[in-house]
Amino acid sequence: GQTLRISYIGYEGQEVKWEGQALNIVLKESNNSFSEAVVIGYGVAKKNDMTGSVAAIKPDEKNKGLVVNAQDMIQGKIAGVNVTTSSGTPGAGATIRIRGGSSLNASNDPLIVIDGLAMDNQGVKGLSNPLSMVNPADIESFTVLKDASATAIYGSRGSNGVIIITTKKGRKGAQLKVSYNGSMSVNQKRRVQEVMSGDQFVEFVKTYYGEGSDAYKALGVMEDGKQKFYNTDWQNEIYRTALSFDNNVTVTGSVKNVPFRASVGATNQEGILRTSDFNRYTASLNVNPSLLDDHLKVNLSAKYMFAKTVYADGGAMGAALGMDPTKPVRTADPRFKNFGGYYQWLQEGSVLKDSKWPETKIDLATANPLSMIDMKNDVAKSNAFVGNLELDYQVHGLKDLRLHMNIGADVSGGRQDTEISPASGTNTYYGYSGWEKINKYNLSY
């Protein structure tokens, strides 16, 4: 005889042995089918029973690799949800719109709920949005509430839609398991703007202005009494091949009837623009026992994140297109000692009345792009903690009556320090030093 397997979406599959006889098979409805059950504000409901517009997805297996922010996992996956990355900076956040914007003046950001805790959309330094603090490897599912029914659960905060994130948890009776997941990615610039090389620029000036012109004499630099032309590719100087790494260690198991899951993660993402960098370290703990004959479900979760973001001077990208390609990146000429050896367009600096600075950079001239990057130190460090206790009690004797309680805390803070050297072409002589700090404390119950 042959063994037949009969299955259908939303039902439990069956295997039966067939030896030529007629079969009458009835499939049992599955209560564990993810496509049939969605997480909403007050618990879990069958998708067929929902009257509002709800989309539920699991992270796509095709997205395996380095995914830095949670918003990258839903980009292009849910109808009516538009995710636009704010910039190419490592660890950058994104603008999320559900069915477009609804206000010209007020915020159009959707409410983000992580394991039952509604998050404040106000970011801190180095932490672009609440999704940045969640390790993508810890996410079990996304549920998006799109229409006005979301306000019935979350009030006016849900008027722009709601994104509910459920993180992974332990399973009752599971054996202790330790797992590791790591990935590496290589990023390169896709293309650069086409500009003249140093040789082409020299030929252009020679053809249209002549070798005796001031424009021709301004090309290159004087070395040993001779005019020397360089062939500097400024775009190549400021961009790099970026390596990124992601490592995660997870411990899952169950102590008697108390399942748990703990994880730590480390992400390092280099930016294509030199010196830009993003480092994030996360830790999470989920304990989810069921008590009183499974009538009382407890979910205790805690998440911590530390992030360090190094911002490069984005103005260097424009400067790389406008800087003279016949000039060197650095020079041993003592005139440029005050500029760290980087070539700059100079003028008499008598206005400073400082004998140590006989020359300064011409204000209207293009600054050395590499100097703009190397002479600026812009670092943001942020910490975030989210803790939540969720209790769901099904009243004995009344299976349709549930009591739900949620209490949580969202504590985060970030500080950004910016320092620009006096040798920089953007803040010559004076330099710059400053910092900005933002702390956030929210208690929800």
Which residues fall in each region the model found?
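Acidic/polar loop-and-plug regions of large Gram-negative outer-membrane beta-barrel proteins
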Residues: M305, V310-A384
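Short, small/polar-rich motifs associated with maturation and membrane association
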Residues: G1-M305, D313, W357, V386-G387
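Short alpha-helical linear motifs
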Residues: Q200-K206, N288, L321-T326, G425-G431
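Proline-rich low-complexity regions
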Residues: P110-L111, A118, P325, P334, ...
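Small-side-chain secondary-structure face that scaffolds active or pore-lining regions
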Residues: Q193, I272-S284, H295, S301-M305, ...
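Short glycine-enriched loops at secondary-structure junctions
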Residues: G43, S355, G408-V411
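Asparagine-centered polar/low-complexity signal
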Residues: N160, N286, T366-N368, Y445
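Outer-membrane beta-barrel proteins
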Residues: S86, Q235-Y239, T250, G271-T275, ...
